[in-house]
Curated annotation (Swiss-Prot):
This is Minor capsid protein VP2. Keywords: Capsid decoration protein, Capsid protein, Host cytoplasm, Virion. The N-terminus domain points away from the virion surface. Its main location: virion. Pfam families: Vesi_VP2. Minor structural protein that forms a portal-like structure at a unique three-fold axis of symmetry, following binding to the host receptor. The channel formed by VP2 may allow the delivery of the viral genome through the host endosomal membrane.
Length: 133
């Protein structure tokens, strides 16, 4: 074997070894890259699941809030209708329950018999016993 052939054989063996080491390093690098991509994909999937859960919960909250506001608006509408239709009668009944006189045909200046009697008794007491008042 000539020297040139030996050098050529040695060079090709060195290249084969370098290629082998390079391919092993590339395989390790590729495996690490795939592992990191898998972890990143897993984290992205978890984030999307959390985001979807948040959006579903927010939708449910908005739905409950909307139903609540609708119910309140409906109650207010019925209360306004009831006060518009029955308000004067309810006011008159409340005044009568509180002890006020309520005569629909009165202009407010007429006194009932009991009121006149009470005024006369009060005037009489003040006239005869001024120190009491």
């Amino acid at each position: 074997m000539s020297v040139a052939a030996a050098i050529t054989a040695g060079a090709s063996a060195a290249q084969a070894g370098t290629g082998l080491i390079g391919s092993i390093a590339n395989a390790i690098h590729e495996g690490t890259r795939l592992k990191l991509q898998g972890q990143a994909l897993g984290a992205q999937i978890k984030f999307q699941e959390a985001e979807n859960k948040f959006n579903r919960d927010r939708f449910e909250f908005d739905k409950l809030n909307t139903e609540r506001w609708f119910r309140l608006a409906k109650e207010q509408q019925s209360l306004v209708y009831e006060l518009n239709t029955k308000g004067p009668a309810m006011r008159a009944q409340a005044m009568m329950d509180a002890g006020f006189r309520n005569n629909l045909y009165s202009n407010g200046n007429q006194l009932t018999f009991n009121e006149v009697r009470e005024a006369q008794l009060s005037a009489e007491k003040r006239f005869y016993n001024p120190s009491l008042f």
